[in-house]
Amino acid sequence: MSAPLRVAVVMTAVYAAGGIGMVYLPLWLGQCGLTAAAISQIYGLSSLLRLGATPAWGEVADRLGRVRPVLILAAAATAALSLGYLPAWGFLAVLAVLTLQSFCSAALQPLCDTLLLGLAHDGRLDYGRVRAVGSAAFLVTAVAGGPVVAAFGSASAPVLMAMIYAAAAGLGPLLPDARPRARPPSTLGSFRLLTNPTFRITVLMSALIQSSNGAYYSLSSLHWRAAGLGETTIGLLWAEGVVAETVMFLFAGPLGARLGPGWLAGLGGV
């Protein structure tokens, strides 16, 4: 199995778990004694944590000099913590579980992207097309998860998440054991990036795009259920947006070459 295919397989599992968690986990949290306001607050706090957790995991991988064991550890911990939602009840208990799980899961997509971008840099794959595989996996579980959750109840959502994250950890040894191309930068050197105006603009654009999605990520499933829609329909509504994302990734390479990264990012924001 080629290195790009091995990374794509693991990435598929990571994004598939996200399809269950993002679409159906809020439905379970709504049965754990939480209001919609409390759920949005918990997701907001976990998002703040991820701001520090993501670069921290990257720093660990840099210092260790290997990406694969860090990704496997994070996937296994995320799988175990997913089961913690089942006994959790009330704001503080759910906050504790979601905080710990968010810290661990913050490593997964960025480290998969690190491996993909390294292979793309070597000319061994088209990043956008392979990344579209992840979006497709999200789409499949978002749609297929609806009948499962409808049949077994929303408590099945964290169980499905745990199973898929465990599969990602089990597939982890297939990953190429990538090592840094150069000496890891110092922490001070990382902060010097903030003096780069292009980097600051990129971070600002990313922050605006991601924050605009916050309410949609945390509350859309609850809103649609309150409107009387079933789990299968909710999954299909999520899938509609992911189809657009997948098409965007498929054509990101040619569009980026024609428009440039700035216009491409702006198109993504639209």
Mark where each language-model region is.
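Helix-loop boundary and gating motifs at the non-cytosolic
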Residues: 1-47, 199-237
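Cytoplasmic helix-loop-helix junction between adjacent transmembrane helices
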Residues: 97-133
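Juxtamembrane intracellular "pre-TM" segments in multi-pass secondary transporters
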Residues: 1-2, 172-208
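Helix-to-loop junctions at the C-terminal end of transmembrane segments
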Residues: 52-66, 149-150, 247-261
